[in-house]
Amino acid sequence: MATAAAASTALTGATTAAPKARRRAHLLATRRALAAPIRCSAASPAMPMAPPATPLRPWGPTDPRKGADILVESLERCGVRDVFAYPGGASMEIHQALTRSPVIANHLFRHEQGEAFAASGYARSSGRVGVCIATSGPGATNLVSALADALLDSVPMVAITGQVPRRMIGTDAFQETPIVEVTRSITKHNYLVLDVDDIPRVVQEAFFLASSGRPGPVLVDIPKDIQQQMAVPVWDKPMSLPGYIARLPKPPATELLEQVLRLVGESRRPVLYVGGGCAASGEELRRFVELTGIPVTTTLMGLGNFPSDDPLSLRMLGMHGTVYANYAVDKADLLLALGVRFDDRVTGKIEAFASRAKIVHVDIDPAEIGKNKQPHVSICADVKLALQGMNALLEGSTSKKSFDFGSWNDELDQQKREFPLGYKTSNEEIQPQYAIQVLDELTKGEAIIGTGVGQHQMWAAQYYTYKRPRQWLSSAGLGAMGFGLPAAAGASVANPGVTVVDIDGDGSFLMNVQELAMIRIENLPVKVFVLNNQHLGMVVQWEDRFYKANRAHTYLGNPENESEIYPDFVTIAKGFNIPAVRVTKKNEVRAAIKKMLETPGPYLLDIIVPHQEHVLPMIPSGGAFKDMILDGDGRTVY
């Protein structure tokens, strides 16, 4: 067995001598292969996969290696093929170890917030755990918004941070922040690793926690001296999560599912209210709708979980949902709430929401059941298992249960005809809704769509056709501006060959504009679709409606020359060597979008739209369906 010192020397020599071209070719080959499933998951928490042998690692199974290498090998054993990591003093050892990995590719974003949003986009679009890595201090704190976002939107992520050496913890050392304490309330769980021998177990637990039950972010903080310490890893240590595993939801009882189906049989006006918790249940949901004929509305997080072009789709409900979706929920006598949390942007005035309906709430997280709206029947279970169980009961029934909701669906079809989504048109100005409709038409509704936060986000939700789960990526619960570009890039990494479009606003886009560098360097085919109104559009809309149009720092252009488009995103994009075009007239839009989609690699399209446009319909905050606003814009005095 090699000594620790000899192994350390051999390790350093191997790193400096490793041919970069060979490793790059290996990684490219891996990139083309389908990503392996996460082994450290709820389905198979104790099935570690040994990493392949490689000359980059000059040690045998029983030889010591650095803690950082144990960490990277642990990630490999959990099926990780991509990480989003930005180096710094306290994480350098991890980056050195990554250069010795034959299978993990690092995607170098230019800001830790960008890399963490990319990990989120990667996870949202693929269902796999997204991994981001940052240094201590400001590197770690730059992850905070993305961790909070992932917790609210139930995104499986593992964030790994470097930390100052153990002996310096608590001394206010350079770039020291107590990131475990900082993130305690915005992660599902977090760890401070104080023993190098704990790394394999902690990583396995982190992936299991992130991906099981209600998914969420887990943070692992590793001091630098632990990363440098030599040790022989023990890979078969069992996880130590007895309380957590015992509380994981069990398959739903057949008696409860039969009770739900009895309620469906007694109902005349049922509605399915579907959220992000159905992302893994699209097939089961479609089958349930086929068997019952119940109309479906989705939350912002639920877009794509049921095809929005299906005749039984009511599209999105809530503050900026369709009239007919909100009408259906208001008139319903039965509301089947699947994988939702009765968020305030959906319910408005909670007492008035679905006030005529019996409510069935199915969710994997017991904390969500009864938190905002008390259900008549609650099932704490995986929605996928609940739907599978109900489908089996429906398909196996000797009497072949049949439901007739024809008159109810006819009533809703009439609402669709009377109150379709719409907007005012003009000959010259480009309506943002029109631009998205053209994008939808030219991509045939097949693109993965990422967005920032604001008016453009709502228009993208309303006017693009979402046909499958994991097609829509947006910061829903936290509402974090700057999410769109890095999330789209992360989705592009996870889904090579798939068209990915970042529908963004000028305000959101500018918050992480530096990530144009990364998509250019890796030549990711991310199409940046900026709806540029020179304002913080959603805040302007609220100023128009509720503050007598008094502008309070919502203009983002140049006050000394308001006719100028400022900043010039076309010039900025070209500075990153990304082709870019600006369009200002409606008759230019179709050809410009077609060129964007046909151009290989990244592309930016700057679409100038009027700032007076409002997102409609709109239910004011705290309002009810009866308070819905259907017309007007910034050209109107309120």
From Swiss-Prot:
Q: Where is this region: Disordered?
A: 1-23
Q: Which Gene3D superfamilies does the record match to this protein? A: 3.40.50.970, TPP-binding domain
What's in the GO CC field? acetolactate synthase complex; chloroplast
Checking CDD domains in the record gives: TPP_AHAS (cd02015), TPP_PYR_POX_like (cd07035)
Q: Which residues bind Mg(2+)?
A: 506, 533
Q: What is its EC number?
A: 2.2.1.6
The pathway is: Amino-acid biosynthesis; L-isoleucine biosynthesis; L-isoleucine from 2-oxobutanoate: step 1/4; Amino-acid biosynthesis; L-valine biosynthesis; L-valine from pyruvate: step 1/4
Q: Which UniProt keywords apply?
A: Amino-acid biosynthesis, Branched-chain amino acid biosynthesis, Chloroplast, Disulfide bond, FAD, Flavoprotein, Herbicide resistance, Magnesium, Metal-binding, Plastid, Thiamine pyrophosphate, Transferase, Transit peptide
Stretches with biased composition (Low complexity): 1-19
Gene Ontology annotations of biological process type: isoleucine biosynthetic process; L-valine biosynthetic process; response to herbicide
What Pfam families does this protein map onto? TPP_enzyme_C, TPP_enzyme_M, TPP_enzyme_N
Where in the cell?
A: Plastid, Chloroplast
Q: Which residues form the signal peptide?
A: none
Q: Does the keyword Membrane apply?
A: no
Q: Which cofactor does it need?
A: Mg(2+); thiamine diphosphate
Q: Record's PANTHER family?
A: ACETOLACTATE SYNTHASE CATALYTIC SUBUNIT, MITOCHONDRIAL, THIAMINE PYROPHOSPHATE ENZYMES
Q: What else is known?
A: Acetolactate synthase is the target enzyme for sulfonylurea and imidazolinone herbicides.
Q: What is this protein called?
A: Acetolactate synthase 1, chloroplastic
| Native source organism of the sequence | Zea mays (Maize)
